[in-house]
Regions:
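Conserved catalytic core of the tyrosine transesterase superfamily
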Residues: 1-291
Length: 291
């Protein structure tokens, strides 16, 4: 029987449990001898399609029940934030400075790029800016008087992001070297230059981060975005201000930030459970005389 031969009345016969069992089936099933899986995100897309299908005919008064609307969307479990721990950040920056664990060939390039690499990674870790915002920086975007950089956010608007002393020192050291580099035509204003004296590309920074981070940890796949997550995590731990973190990271919707750092919120609530002591000492009555 072809699907076009089914009457619309069949839709009214479908129960909520039928759709729930369908979604459960979609978690793992076989097709052409292969196992097919769907996580919550995939099942949510399929339910959304069903909802639209049902809603169209229900709004047109061609079916009596909108059964799909009764089924809640599968709850998506956010993945744990992958980030560097504070000790790993220190090891990473130390390694960039001294070049330990680099190959002989890599060390030849390291002599030329060390100050740039230190400045770039310190900036990413110390401000949480996106890699696209980093490579888009011009020299004039850095304001040492006010300790800030002017970046171009997603959407094209400009924002000022402030940096601390470590970032300032790393940038000043690099800019002293940068003054002696003759940029390629059209790249005169670029802050970070490649060995070809051209503005660095996003892919170049991704490879740079991978090169150094792979020597620090093999259990985490560290990318420039993970350095951004590292900054956001430490800023939230320090301030406990989700709105500040959202503003600094350039999230237009604070719920985006809250979603990413939900695990830290949960950890904070668990810690709060032990913050209030019902008894000052567990043996407070032990010194009282017997009655």
């Amino acid at each position: 029987m072809e699907i076009t031969e089914f009457p619309l009345s069949v839709l009214d016969m479908v129960q909520r449990t039928d759709i729930e069992e369908y979604l459960d089936y979609m978690s793992l099933y076989q097709k052409d001898g292969k196992n097919i899986t769907n996580e919550e995100r995939g099942k949510a897309r399929k339910l959304a399609a069903l909802r639209s299908f049902y809603n169209y005919y229900f709004q047109s008064e061609r079916i009596e029940k909108n059964t799909a609307a009764l089924v809640p969307l599968p709850k998506r479990h956010e993945k744990e934030i992958i980030r560097l721990e504070p000790n790993e950040v220190a090891i990473l920056l130390d390694q960039v400075e001294d070049g330990t664990k680099l190959t002989k060939k890599e060390l030849e390039y390291h002599k030329k790029t060390k100050l740039r690499d230190v400045a770039l990674l310190t900036l990413l870790l110390g401000t949480g800016i996106r890699v696209s915002e980093c490579v888009g920086l011009d020299i004039n975007d850095v304001d040492f008087n006010n300790g800030g950089i002017k970046i171009r956010r997603k959407g094209g608007y400009e924002a000022i992001v402030y940096f601390g002393d470590e970032v300032e020192t790393a940038l000043l050291d690099y800019l002293e070297q940068r003054e002696h580099i003759i940029p390629a035509e059209g790249h005169e204003n670029a802050l970070f230059l490649s060995l070809q004296s051209r503005r660095m590309a996003v892919r170049s920074v991704e490879n740079l981060v991978k090169k150094y981070a792979s020597r620090v940890t093999t259990l985490k796949k560290i990318t420039p975005h993970k350095l951004r997550s590292t900054y956001g995590t430490e800023l939230y731990k320090e301030t406990r201000d989700i709105y500040l973190v959202a503003d600094v990271l350039g999230h237009k919707d604070v719920n985006t930030t809250r979603k990413h750092y939900a695990a830290l919120e949960e950890q904070r609530r668990r810690q709060a459970a032990n913050a209030f002591h019902l008894r000052e000492h567990s043996n407070r009555h032990s010194d009282q005389p017997d009655k």
